[in-house]
Amino acid sequence: MRAFLCLVFAAILAASPAAAQQTENERLVAYFDYVVFGNEFAGRALPTVRKWTEPIRYKFASNNAAITKYRPVVQAHFASLAQFTNLSFQEIGPRDPGENFIIGFAPLAGLVAYGRTLAANPAEVAGRQFETASCFFLSYIQDGRLVAARVLAGSDLPDQELVHCLLEELAQSLGLPNDDDRVAPSIFNDSLHLTSLSLIDKVLLRLVYDPRMRPGTPRAQALQLARAILAELNPGGG
């Protein structure tokens, strides 16, 4: 893990000369804050850590050409996310009970309408952020724990964009909900369209899913804890 973080710190410095004025640990804590607590639509910070504590049992909402094509992509994305969260992901059949995660595809023109059919409350899929989205996620929380999620993606997107979109939304539905172009290189930076996790993304996932980062942890406490975890892994922060 220590060698892994050394690579991350080198990547941060290469990404932005401004990082020279800020220790690597401080910069990663800032990235953690942007992605975990930022809220691009509400304009205010989310108050607590949200994360999964139970295995994820996912299914595809319907059987169509997009699912046939992109099932291996989703499986690969989940395998990558599992490495850095210690979550388990199991696909179940479309008629099997017990799912807590649903993935659906529809043409962009009908994506919002389709999303409403999968939402716990159709009215929650409303507003400009959905009307202009090429993919989006919905998540449901109990006591800081994520207990259900939906990911919707436009089936007529260009291939590379859809691969990126799936990875970003799947990761965001795990408790890292915000996009922020200050985080680079990262899947959470919409200007880059990465199709695999960057080193920075892997650290952010590890921080959220460190056992000490409990669901419902208030933001201020979580930032202190993230700083302490990074200090253990990179003493001195430089």
Regions found by a protein language model. Name each.
Residues M1-A3:
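Positively charged n-region of N-terminal signal peptides that target proteins for export
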Residues C6-A14:
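Bacterial N-terminal signal peptides
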Residues A19-R57, N64-A66, A133-I141, N234-G238:
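Disordered inhibitory propeptide/activation segment of secreted metzincin zinc metalloprotease zymogens
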Residues V29, C165-E168, L197:
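Residue-level recognition of hydrophobic positions within alpha-helical transmembrane segments
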Residues A30, Y34, A76, S80-Q83, ...:
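Charged/polar, solvent-exposed surface patches and flexible loops
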Residues A42, A120-E161, P177-G238:
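Metalloprotease/metallohydrolase-associated module, dominated by Zn2+-dependent proteases
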Residues N64, Y70-L167, Q172-V183:
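Metzincin-family zinc-dependent endopeptidase catalytic domain
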